[in-house]
Design a protein with these regions (language model features):
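Bacterial N-terminal signal peptides that target proteins for export
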Residues: 1-9
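Pepsin/retropepsin-fold aspartyl endopeptidases
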Residues: 12-13, 18-330
Length: 330
């Protein structure tokens, strides 16, 4: 008989994710580490564009195999905390579920929890990976999502314009002492301190699988002309009504200013409560798409740069880039 776990939040298409309580019995705890079994060396993974609708790019895909099954189309999600796949893909991977959880976001949705013996993303191979299984689709046009934090044993260079994910080993003195100690946590969301419109301070989620950016109702305020009539937001766990913000929203992060084309005002109180901090917004894929993100989960830092700045040295030889923003990993 399945055991029910604490509610989980998954940030996928403005859905929040995360597992907070351990499961009884022999199953590893929610923060158990997946084992990296491929050599600890540089990798360059090719990403493919994800178009759930013909004219709207909403993320990037990695191709992966779970337990040696058929290749799966997995959306790379910096807001997810573990792999989530739909019913159709489940039949080909042979995972047995030992517990249940709730994926909660705009609504809630039950999921079964199992463990994959192997997960292969090109030449990169892991074992003992936590997987959430849901009935129906996770996202139309894909088999599921894969968390960016799965690769957190490496320094990550996520080049969205070039559609490449670079995995860079840390220096030897920082290299794990033995293969058995190499692992990646699967509960890390990218939360960065930000100032919105020059006055509202808080934390912002960087979510490569969100189809648009969002701000809290508190930040959006209620002046007439700033919010358009309500629009329905569909997501994996349900739907909600948000308001399209008609005025520009400026996100300032570590000296870098990002101005998304589309921003929706939503109730982000659940996200704030479950992250344990004041979340004022979400930067989705369309806003992040022009940039290169360099992410160190180990040092809790992220750098957001335009491709041009990557090759522009300062006069004194230093790299011409904004300072990295500290990550509040939750």
């Amino acid at each position: 008989m399945w055991r029910r776990e604490a509610a989980a939040f998954l940030v996928t298409w403005l859905i929040v994710g995360g597992l907070r309580a351990s499961e009884a019995g022999s199953t590893p705890a929610p923060d158990a580490r997946a084992d990296l079994v491929s050599p600890y060396q540089p990798y360059d993974l090719k990403l493919r564009p994800f178009y759930p609708a013909p004219s709207r790019a909403a993320g990037v895909l990695l191709q992966g195999c779970i337990n040696g099954g058929r290749p799966l189309r997995l959306v790379l999600d910096s807001g997810a905390e573990f792999i989530v796949i739909g019913a159709k893909a489940v039949r080909s991977i042979g995972i047995s579920a030992r517990s249940e959880m709730e994926l909660v976001g705009l609504g809630s949705r039950p999921a079964r929890v199992g463990w994959a013996e192997t997960v292969e993303i090109g030449p990169v191979r892991f074992r003992n990976c936590r997987v959430a299984l849901v009935d129906g689709n996770v996202i139309d046009g894909a088999d599921g999502v894969i968390p960016l934090s799965l690769f957190s044993d490496f320094l990550l260079r996520l080049n969205l314009p070039e559609k490449r994910l670079g995995l860079i080993p840390y220096p030897r003195e920082q290299d794990p002492a033995s293969p058995s100690s190499r692992g990646v946590t699967q509960r890390d969301l990218l939360l960065v301190a930000a100032v919105l419109n020059g006055k509202q301070s808080g934390h912002v989620v960087l979510d490569t699988a969100a189809f648009c950016s969002a701000i809290s109702h508190e930040v959006a305020g209620s002046p007439r002309g700033h919010l358009a009539p309500g629009i329905r937001i569909e997501a994996v766990t349900g739907a909600a009504t948000g308001q399209l913000v008609s005025s520009a929203v400026h996100f300032q992060i570590a000296g870098q200013e990002l101005i998304p084309n589309e921003v929706v005002a939503l109730d982000l109180s659940n996200l704030s409560r479950h992250c344990g901090m004041h979340v004022v917004g979400v930067l989705g894929f369309p806003a992040l798409r022009p940039y290169v993100l360099t992410i160190s989960y180990r040092n809790a830092l992220v750098k957001i740069e335009s491709p041009k700045r990557l090759s522009m040295p300062e006069e004194d030889g230093r790299h011409n880039a904004k300072s990295p923003a500290p990550l509040a990993l939750r």
